[in-house]
């Protein structure tokens, strides 16, 4: 247990940040999972709709500073490639 006031504050801050990070990481995973599930069942319309939402959300996280620009672009690019693959098939 912390012996100093500043150490106690740091513990509180760490807990708060951990919860916030967990929330965003879960949200990102769920967004990506939704697109991948639509791709898995070859539902082109649903996949494109979810890709549009994923693109919007991931870039919103970039503007908030949660994700780096290249990370979001890479994720969107890979999702886009998988959706395009089933659309052409």
From Swiss-Prot:
GO terms for molecular function: small ribosomal subunit rRNA binding; structural constituent of ribosome. InterPro entries: Ribosomal_bS20, Ribosomal_bS20_sf. This is Small ribosomal subunit protein bS20. GO terms for cellular component: cytosol; small ribosomal subunit. It comes from Helicobacter acinonychis (strain Sheeba). Disulfide bonds: none annotated. Keywords: Ribonucleoprotein, Ribosomal protein, RNA-binding, rRNA-binding. Belongs to the bacterial ribosomal protein bS20 family.
């Amino acid at each position: 247990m912390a012996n100093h006031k500043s150490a106690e504050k740091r513990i509180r801050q760490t807990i708060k940040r951990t919860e916030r990070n967990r929330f965003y990481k879960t949200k990102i995973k769920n967004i990506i999972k939704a697109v991948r599930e639509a791709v898995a069942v070859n539902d082109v319309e649903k996949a494109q709709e979810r890709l549009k939402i994923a693109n919007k959300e991931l870039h919103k996280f970039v503007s908030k500073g949660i994700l780096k620009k290249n990370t979001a672009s890479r994720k969107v690019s890979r999702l886009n490639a998988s959706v395009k693959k089933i659309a052409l098939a």
